[in-house]
Amino acid sequence: SVKINNVIPIYVIPVGYIDTNESHHSSHNKPLPNKMISIGRYSPEKQLDHQIELMSKLVPAFPNLQLHLFGFGKEETHYRKLIAQYHLENHVFLRGFIYDLNQEIETAYVSLLTSKMEGFNLGVLETIAKGVPTVSYDTKYGPSELIVNHKNGFIIEQDNKEQLYHSVKKLLLDSNLREQFSKESIKHAQIFNDKNVFDTWVTVFRTLKVNL
């Protein structure tokens, strides 16, 4: 907590948390090689077209690479046309809204975030909690809370498609780096576990009770 003029306490509490009892998965021995995921609405601010364009550059070097986009929204038709334009029908999949993404996340190698703007991204929290490293634009305001650059993922310059390409390619090529980022992702996610979040709420309510 922080105090303004030593009077008003301010607490920063995440909008989501992870279950401390959840199982975690190593990046080794995943059943589907080179599967990447992205969780978010099919809307302009998410810039999923950047990810589709990225795939057009990566597939020649990684012919088994897949990108699964989970979400819904008005840009779906546009994205389908873009996928067809790049002949990526066997590589990019618009999966729509899925209630339980646990299995999908557990079988992924990399998560992508290419938004213009973000809050506290619950999708990224879910992926790092399961050991899936994320490559994200340096978007205001949420990703930097969840991703420590070069430790559990990559945070790259906003809208820098070339840097996006090289960062993702590096992760796909280097299994040791993926494993390192995977372990650090699980570790970093524990900051947002249910106990820590609930304890902060308890502190807030106790402070309110004292000041009433």
Residue ranges and their predicted role:
Residues 1-23:
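Donor nucleotide-sugar binding/catalytic pocket of nucleotide-sugar-dependent glycosyltransferases
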Residues 28-46, 52-55, 68:
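Conserved donor-binding/catalytic core segment of Leloir-type glycosyltransferases
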Residues 163, 170, 177-191, 203:
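A short, well-ordered alpha-helix in the C-terminal region of glycosyltransferases
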Residues 194-212:
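C-terminal alpha-helical cap of glycosyltransferases
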Residues 97, 116:
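Aromatic "clamp/platform" in nucleotide-sugar-dependent glycosyltransferases that forms part
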Residues 48-93, 173-177, 212:
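A conserved nucleotide-sugar
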Residues 149-150, 154-161, 170-176:
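Conserved acidic donor-binding segment of nucleotide-sugar-dependent glycosyltransferases
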Residues 133-137:
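Short hydrophobic beta-strand element within catalytic cores of glycosyltransferases
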